């Protein structure tokens, strides 16, 4: 794989070292399958998470452009927004977050606790909207207004999921391949598929580094018909920028996100409790709980290609547990 193309893109060091790839012995015994976990939940800024990989590239680009303000958008309990504003605070940048309440709740914990509490600690300028119906356009409108106030804004898309941001997960695929080399013969990788950048970056990287490994994206907000074009679009954009081909099919399971984005379900919450009780690992109700529910059910229903070892990508999100009490 011509990884030298990745060096064409400026990158700000935020993570510092490969995140752990660990065997989960008690969960493996429980499920009757070797299960490993990639601990992107323990990245070092603001309670961790996968978005830091994307922000290494996006914020480097913002600094290159001379920006003094980061603008992004997401749900009130967005992990992406939390990590973006924390990086802004670390770098002395202003940060504006455009937030929506996607589940229409008036529950105090959701509106004030978890990730939302942390946004205040990071001194974020909060802008509320009724809904992020066209987030790219809404972010550009906000950026125009902020620029008129004398700031130099840089827009970071929802989830950090642009081709540039997703380079962080092409690099993650390299990290996984190096950690598994001559140690673990992975059969499958499972990841939550939301804004699609993490999924698409892994798809490009794994196709070239571990072509026999099956990559499954468990959707957290959309049907396969809605999500697949988003992942493919990013997959092709990433490959184009790296002068690579990307022909691997995109595999998605959409059986585990109902009743909708940001709304806990029983299978997801059972997965959260299972990982906590067996391994001391904290998942979340929005992304990783539902993705783990897919992994567990996929084993039960024999949905994977074979019976080999499975790697679960832990993208973070534990701060949201506090926002979803008493569901937890």
Swiss-Prot record:
Name the needed cofactors. pyridoxal 5'-phosphate
Name its GO BP terms in alphabetical order.
D-amino acid metabolic process
- Cite the entry's keywords alphabetically: Lyase, Pyridoxal phosphate
Keyword flag Nucleus: no
The catalytic activity of this protein is classed by the Enzyme Commission as: 4.4.1.15
Q: Which branch of life, at top level?
A: Bacteria
A molecular function annotated in GO for this UniProt entry is:
D-cysteine desulfhydrase activity
Reaction(s) catalysed by this chain, per the record, are: D-cysteine + H2O = hydrogen sulfide + pyruvate + NH4(+) + H(+)
UniProt-listed InterPro entries: ACCD_DCysDesulf, D-Cys_desShydrase, D_Cys_desulphydr_bac, TrpB-like_PALP, TrpB-like_PALP_sf
Which CDD domains is this protein grouped with?
ACCD
State if Protein biosynthesis is listed as a keyword.
no
Which positions bear N6-(pyridoxal phosphate)lysine? Answer: 51
Signal peptide positions (record)? none
Q: Which Gene3D superfamilies match?
A: 3.40.50.1100
According to its UniProt entry, the function of this protein is described as: Catalyzes the alpha,beta-elimination reaction of D-cysteine and of several D-cysteine derivatives. It could be a defense mechanism against D-cysteine.
Which HAMAP family does this one have? D_Cys_desulfhydr
- The family this protein is said to belong to: Belongs to the ACC deaminase/D-cysteine desulfhydrase family.
Quaternary organization: Homodimer.
Name of this protein: D-cysteine desulfhydrase
Species of origin = Salmonella paratyphi C (strain RKS4594)
Q: Which gene encodes it?
A: dcyD
